[in-house]
C-alpha cells in the first residue's frame, strides 16, 4: 500500500487522472490524500468531486477556501466567482449528495507521520490546539448552523491567536488559518493579502507562517496546498504541494513512503 498526497486540484480532473496513472494508483490498495480546493477554476470541478467521493475510504480530503465558498454559493449566500467553473455542480442530479459529502470533510487530517491541511497550521498553535480548533469548526459545518457560519466567516479579523477567543472570532481565526493563511507579520498576526513568493518579500515585514521564529514546533510533518507561489516547497517537515496547475503550472503529488515526487503538467 502507498500513500499519495496531492496539492490543489481546482477542477483539473484530467491532470489528476494522468498523475494517478503515472503511479498505477489502485483504490483497493493505495490511499489518496487531497490538500483541499477540489473545485474552482479548472474545467471539471463536478467530475473531480464525483471521482474523489467515489474513492470512499481510499481518499482523505481536507477543506480549502474554494470548497467553503462552494458551500456558501450552494446556500445562496455567495455568487459563483467570475473565473470559477463550478456552475455544472449546481445543476447536477447528484448535487445534494456531493455537497453533503463535502460538508463531512475535515479541516485537518492526520496520519501517523504527518498532518494535512489546506493552507497551514497557525505558528502559535501546538498540535493539540490545532486538533481542537479544527474539530470545533468541523462540528458546526456538519450541523444546522452551517449557513450561519458560511454567512459570517468572511473576515480578516481576528488576526492574532489568543486562547480566550470564543464563538465567531475563534471560528474565523481557525478557518483563516487552515484555509487562507500564507504570511504572518513578525509578531505572529496573520496577513491575508500577500500572495507573492517569499523571496520577493522582506522578512522584516512578512514571514511565511512556517518560518516564524517563535513558531511552536510540531511533532509531525505538515503537508498543505494553497500557496502556488511556493512552487512546491519541500523540506523535512514542511511540504507545500500546490504548484499552480490551474494557472498553467503543474499538479504535484508526493508518495509518502519514499518521498518521491510526481508531477503532471497542466493540459490547457
Swiss-Prot record:
Keyword RNA-binding in annotation: no
Keyword Hydrolase: yes
CDD domains: MPP_ApaH (cd07422)
Enzyme class: hydrolase
Keywords per UniProt: Hydrolase
InterPro entries tied to this protein: ApaH (IPR004617), Calcineurin-like_PHP_ApaH (IPR004843), Metallo-depent_PP-like (IPR029052)
MF (Gene Ontology): bis(5'-nucleosyl)-tetraphosphatase (symmetrical) activity
E.C. designation(s): 3.6.1.41
One Pfam family in the UniProt entry: Metallophos
Catalytic activity: P(1),P(4)-bis(5'-adenosyl) tetraphosphate + H2O = 2 ADP + 2 H(+)
Family assignment from sequence similarity: Belongs to the Ap4A hydrolase family.
HAMAP family assigned: ApaH (MF_00199)
Function text: Hydrolyzes diadenosine 5',5'''-P1,P4-tetraphosphate to yield ADP.
Protein name per UniProt: Bis(5'-nucleosyl)-tetraphosphatase, symmetrical
Lineage: Bacteria, Pseudomonadati, Pseudomonadota, Gammaproteobacteria, Vibrionales
Amino acid at each position: 500500500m502507498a500513500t499519495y498526497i496531492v496539492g490543489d486540484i481546482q477542477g483539473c480532473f484530467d491532470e489528476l487522472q494522468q498523475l494517478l496513472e503515472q503511479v498505477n494508483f489502485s483504490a483497493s490498495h493505495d490511499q489518496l490524500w487531497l490538500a483541499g480546493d477540489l473545485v474552482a477554476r479548472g474545467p471539471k470541478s463536478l467530475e473531480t468531486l464525483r471521482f474523489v467521493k467515489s474513492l470512499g475510504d481510499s481518499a482523505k480530503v481536507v477543506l480549502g477556501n474554494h470548497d467553503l465558498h462552494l458551500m456558501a454559493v450552494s446556500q445562496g449566500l455567495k455568487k459563483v466567482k467570475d473565473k470559477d467553473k463550478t456552475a455544472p455542480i449546481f445543476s447536477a442530479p447528484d448535487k445534494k449528495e456531493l455537497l453533503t459529502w463535502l460538508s463531512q470533510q475535515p479541516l485537518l487530517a492526520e496520519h501517523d507521520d504527518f498532518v494535512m491541511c489546506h493552507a497551514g497550521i497557525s505558528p502559535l498553535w501546538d498540535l493539540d490546539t490545532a486538533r481542537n480548533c479544527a474539530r470545533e469548526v468541523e462540528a458546526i459545518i456538519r450541523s444546522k448552523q452551517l449557513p450561519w457560519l458560511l454567512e459570517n466567516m468572511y473576515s480578516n479579523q481576528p488576526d492574532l491567536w489568543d486562547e480566550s477567543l470564543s464563538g465567531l472570532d475563534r471560528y474565523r481565526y481557525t478557518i483563516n488559518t487552515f484555509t487562507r493563511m500564507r504570511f504572518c507579520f513578525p509578531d505572529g498576526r496573520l496577513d491575508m493579502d500577500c500572495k507573492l513568493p517569499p523571496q520577493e518579500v522582506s522578512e522584516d515585514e512578512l514571514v511565511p507562517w512556517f518560518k516564524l521564529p517563535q513558531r511552536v514546533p510540531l511533532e509531525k510533518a505538515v503537508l498543505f496546498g494553497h500557496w502556488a507561489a511556493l512552487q512546491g516547497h519541500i523540506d523535512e517537515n514542511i511540504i507545500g504541494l500546490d504548484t499552480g496547475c490551474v494557472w498553467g503550472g503543474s499538479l504535484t503529488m508526493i508518495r509518502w513512503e519514499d518521498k518521491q515526487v510526481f508531477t503532471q503538467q497542466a493540459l490547457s
